[in-house]
């Protein structure tokens, strides 16, 4: 179970302590548990949603979104912000884009992107609460973190060394594809036709974002992986709320 705890420690702000420094093979296997961590997030958010019944609508949605951000520690939002800055400031140049991603400072485009994504998530949550479609809280985190597994399965990692390289090099690929299949099945069981719609929408957006990354970078980084997760979560919430 160590790979699960590695995944939970990396993807969440929950107080998880590991017995020591994980081996590269254990890091690679931790990717197999990313969808499960997403489902755990979804269950926690679904329970919180039920507990907030009777709370004024806007406050209800704001508390859900706050809990969502706190659960991940803002990790993927940071990747989204860095990617937004780099894509605009990189002017189509690969090395300049990668260099900007490493800059810890956030420019105006990063701030605007974060505001827009959080605003879209908030308004989608308002609509979903009104429509009593709480199952979307299970789907979005599951699909978002499943997408990270899918990304490492089909996309080169372009930064040599570090955690991302260990994940990419030691991911068990056959098991990874099986876990992705089980994740899709879980979405269908949890959401029915809405689950199928969410998976199809996320798949189309995933491959478009991957194509954009391949054209600019020739692969992915940790920051662009975080951006993919955030954008897919947002798309799933909006898709279920609108259709």
Curated annotation (Swiss-Prot):
Function: Joins adenosylcobinamide-GDP and alpha-ribazole to generate adenosylcobalamin (Ado-cobalamin). Also synthesizes adenosylcobalamin 5'-phosphate from adenosylcobinamide-GDP and alpha-ribazole 5'-phosphate.
EC number(s) recorded for this UniProt protein: 2.7.8.26
Recorded GO MF terms: adenosylcobinamide-GDP ribazoletransferase activity; cobalamin 5'-phosphate synthase activity
Keywords: Cell inner membrane, Cell membrane, Cobalamin biosynthesis, Magnesium, Membrane, Transferase, Transmembrane, Transmembrane helix
Membrane topology recorded in Swiss-Prot or TrEMBL: Multi-pass membrane protein
Organism the protein comes from: Pseudomonas fluorescens (strain ATCC BAA-477 / NRRL B-23932 / Pf-5)
PANTHER family: ADENOSYLCOBINAMIDE-GDP RIBAZOLETRANSFERASE
Compartmental location: Cell inner membrane
Lineage of the species this protein comes from: Bacteria, Pseudomonadati, Pseudomonadota, Gammaproteobacteria, Pseudomonadales
Reported cofactor(s): Mg(2+)
Name of this protein: Adenosylcobinamide-GDP ribazoletransferase
Family membership noted in the UniProt record: Belongs to the CobS family.
Catalytic activity: alpha-ribazole + adenosylcob(III)inamide-GDP = adenosylcob(III)alamin + GMP + H(+); alpha-ribazole 5'-phosphate + adenosylcob(III)inamide-GDP = adenosylcob(III)alamin 5'-phosphate + GMP + H(+)
NCBIfam families (alphabetical): cobS, PRK00235.1-5
Gene Ontology BP term (one): cobalamin biosynthetic process
Annotated transmembrane regions: 31-48, 61-81, 109-129, 134-154, 188-208
One protein family per Pfam: CobS
Enzyme type, top EC level: transferase
UniProt keyword Translocase, yes or no: no
InterPro entries: CobS
């Amino acid at each position: 179970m160590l790979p699960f705890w590695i995944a939970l420690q990396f993807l969440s702000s929950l107080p998880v302590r590991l017995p020591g420094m994980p081996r590269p093979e254990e890091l690679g296997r931790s990717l197999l548990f990313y969808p499960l961590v997403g489902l755990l997030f979804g269950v926690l958010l679904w329970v919180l949603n039920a507990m907030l019944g009777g709370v004024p609508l806007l406050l209800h949605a704001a508390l859900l979104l706050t809990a969502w951000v706190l659960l991940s520690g803002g990790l993927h939002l940071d990747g989204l912000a860095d990617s937004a800055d780099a894509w605009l400031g990189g002017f189509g140049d690969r090395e300049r884009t990668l260099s900007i991603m490493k800059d810890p400072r956030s420019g105006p485009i990063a701030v605007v992107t974060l505001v827009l994504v959080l605003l879209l998530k908030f308004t989608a949550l308002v609509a979903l609460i009104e429509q009593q479609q709480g199952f979307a809280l299970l789907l979005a985190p599951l699909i978002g973190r499943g997408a990270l597994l899918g990304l490492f399965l089909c996309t080169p990692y372009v930064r040599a060394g570090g955690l991302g390289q260990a994940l990419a090099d030691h991911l068990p690929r056959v098991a990874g594809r099986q876990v992705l299949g089980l994740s899709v099945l879980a979405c269908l069981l949890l959401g029915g036709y809405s689950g199928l719609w969410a998976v199809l929408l996320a798949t189309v957006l995933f491959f478009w974002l991957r194509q954009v990354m391949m054209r600019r970078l020739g692969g992915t980084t940790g920051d662009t992986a975080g951006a993919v997760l955030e954008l897919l979560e947002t798309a799933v919430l909006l898709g279920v709320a609108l259709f």
